[in-house]
Amino acid sequence: MAGGRRGGRRRKKVCYFTSNGITHIDYKDVELLKKFVSERGKILPRRVTGTSAKYQRKLTVAIKRSRQMALLPFVAEEK
């Protein structure tokens, strides 16, 4: 069995922003942005988070803007 998938159907991910009625993603809302950044500091892709394409673009801009303003780190801190 070389790399076959097991199990049934996966649950469809729902966009966090459309389900909560959020229309504007603010770059100063660091707690919200941290949910969409990995522990290494990378922006999580749509297939992981389930966000729609529209909000993924807005989210990416907000995270990059937040990094430029030094609110979010570019990379994770070493332990």
Swiss-Prot record:
User: Iron as a keyword?
Assistant: no
Q: Which PROSITE patterns match?
A: RIBOSOMAL_S18 (PS00057)
| Entry's Gene Ontology cellular component terms | cytosolic small ribosomal subunit
Q: Which domain of life is it from?
A: Bacteria
The record, for InterPro entries, names: Ribosomal_bS18, Ribosomal_bS18_CS, Ribosomal_bS18_sf
Q: Which GO terms describe its molecular function?
A: small ribosomal subunit rRNA binding; structural constituent of ribosome
Say if the entry is tagged with keyword Nuclease: no
Assigned keywords, A-Z: Ribonucleoprotein, Ribosomal protein, RNA-binding, rRNA-binding
GO BP terms in the entry: translation
| Family of this protein | Belongs to the bacterial ribosomal protein bS18 family.
Q: What job does this protein perform? A: Binds as a heterodimer with protein bS6 to the central domain of the 16S rRNA, where it helps stabilize the platform of the 30S subunit.
Q: What binding partners and quaternary form does the record give?
A: Part of the 30S ribosomal subunit. Forms a tight heterodimer with protein bS6.
What name is this protein filed under? Small ribosomal subunit protein bS18
